Amino acid sequence: MAREENVYMAKLAEQAERYEEMVQFMEKVSTSLGSEELTVEERNLLSVAYKNVIGARRASWRIISSIEQKEESRGNEEHVKCIKEYRSKIESELSDICDGILKLLDSNLIPSASNGDSKVFYLKMKGDYHRYLAEFKTGAERKEAAESTLSAYKAAQDIANTELAPTHPIRLGLALNFSVFYYEILNSPDRACNLAKQAFDEAIAELDTLGEESYKDSTLIMQLLRDNLTLWTSDMQDDGADEIKETKNDNEQQ
């Protein structure tokens, strides 16, 4: 199947909400290019496909983990045993999905990235999927996933800070997700707040230079940064009822 046809099929699959197939079509495009880069549209389609496939399992894992805690507190050992087995199945799916995109990033997408925004886009993506592994892994595997996340985000940040404007939606999206990593995975609220606040303040200072084409994307992510800052600095945090915001849809980040 030709490149254009696979891209078209990926768009069809997205419309039909058949995201596993959308992933397959975009993987075919990604692996058939050699050293050639994906277009912005193609990389966004790939990102959206994987974000939906992983997002469904992350949501499932959170729900199951919450039920597991409740059953443990009630002492329902039989139920807990069933839940642990089911959670393990979801974790296996999560691992497979993350491994798939991480291999693609390392073997094809990152090596062929030639400009600042695509390098940051893919390194951020690499950080995101290592972070998703760190969400459910334990012990040495969690430590390794967290270290890989930090390494990818830092590499992305170094390029973003020199090659992308503070208002660039990809740079802002990186700051958003990097700060979530500090807060949720490394349990470092101070570092999370500092990173989010710095990104927000630097973008505000240059808001008048923002082009019309990315104004909506950039201001949306700035709002998410501010939402998280409000949540994290609040003295009246409840027990996790508020959802920490991260970039949900890379299709909105050109």
From Swiss-Prot:
Cellular component per GO, a single term:
cytoplasm
Any one of the GO BP annotations: protein localization
Subunit notes for this chain? Answer: Homodimer.
Q: Which PANTHER family match?
A: 14-3-3 PROTEIN
Entry similarity comment: Belongs to the 14-3-3 family.
What is the name listed in the Swiss-Prot or TrEMBL entry for this protein? 14-3-3 protein 2
Which gene carries the instructions for this protein?
TFT2
